């Protein structure tokens, strides 16, 4: 009877041990760096959106704290400022944002031990925008900075050994929350905070990300099966008696 009880206990322990958990991450695990580029255009006030495209290029550095939630810092430089008159500089505008990232595929589908070939990631956050210029019109205005808000979806494709690389396509909308650029083309921060389509632009970028190797030997989160070896050894000893 005692052995039967011990056998049941061993079976229960086996089932418990089969439960999977994420291996604990260290401080510098799950960090990535990426480059991106594409085009943007003002959402309203265009005489044909194709003629108002503004090229941009950017850098993103981020960290995933779990397979679902992470943060990133991103900076993009814009090389045109259509539909307005050129500001006279190579880089016309920069936007630097602190972003929250949510892996919707892992949230709703669970994490399976490695990234899926295709994932959808929500991206949102606040940023600082700065307008550059060297002409008289620019110098005559007071405000060249504004508060921005980026809302985006990344359609990401993971590839390479250990899924260390990721390519993504990102449609986004970026609001100038406190500017009146539809009224004064070079005067940004002179209005209250608001979500206004006239103070926004849409953007389509593509990006390439590299995920650094982690302490678990892979480039992503790792699932492990927790075991208490001391308890297992004790039960084996009792079964043998």
What would you call each of these model-derived segments?
Residues 84-86, 160-241:
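Predominantly the C-terminal beta-signal and adjacent terminal strand-loop region
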Residues 69-149:
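Gram-negative (and chloroplast) outer-membrane scaffold detector with strong preference
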Residues 37-43, 75-81, 104-106, 126-132, ...:
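Transmembrane beta-strands of outer-membrane beta-barrel pores
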Residues 20-62:
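Short glycine/proline- and aromatic-enriched beta-strand/turn motifs that initiate or cap beta-hairpins
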Residues 32-34, 70-72, 121-123, 166-170, ...:
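Residue-level detector of the transmembrane beta-barrel scaffold of outer-membrane proteins
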Residues 31, 55-59, 94-98, 102, ...:
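Hydrophobic, lipid-facing positions within transmembrane beta-strands of outer-membrane proteins
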Residues 20-30, 68, 106-120, 159-165, ...:
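Short loop/turn motifs that connect adjacent beta-strands in outer-membrane beta-barrel proteins
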């Amino acid at each position: 009877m005692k052995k039967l009880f011990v056998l049941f206990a061993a079976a229960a322990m086996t089932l418990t041990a089969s439960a999977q958990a994420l291996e604990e991450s260290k401080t510098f695990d799950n960090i990535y760096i990426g480059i991106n580029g594409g085009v943007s255009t003002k959402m309203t006030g265009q005489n044909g959106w194709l003629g108002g495209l503004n090229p941009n290029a950017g850098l993103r550095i981020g960290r995933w704290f779990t397979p679902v939630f992470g943060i990133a810092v991103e900076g993009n430089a814009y090389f045109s400022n259509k539909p307005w008159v050129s500001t006279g500089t190579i880089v016309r505008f920069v936007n630097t944002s602190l972003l929250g990232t949510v892996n919707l595929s892992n949230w709703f589908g669970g994490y399976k031990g490695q990234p899926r070939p295709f994932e959808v990631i929500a991206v949102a956050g606040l940023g600082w925008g700065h307008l550059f210029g060297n002409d008289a019109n620019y110098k005559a205005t007071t405000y060249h900075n504004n508060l921005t808000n980026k809302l985006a979806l990344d359609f990401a494709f993971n590839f390479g050994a250990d899924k260390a690389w990721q390519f993504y396509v990102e449609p986004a909308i970026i609001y100038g929350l406190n500017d009146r650029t539809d009224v004064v083309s070079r005067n940004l921060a002179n209005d209250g905070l608001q979500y206004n389509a006239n103070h926004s632009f849409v953007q389509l970028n593509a990006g390439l990300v590299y995920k650094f190797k982690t302490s678990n030997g892979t480039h992503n989160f790792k699932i492990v099966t927790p075991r208490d070896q001391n308890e297992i050894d004790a039960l084996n000893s009792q079964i043998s008696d």
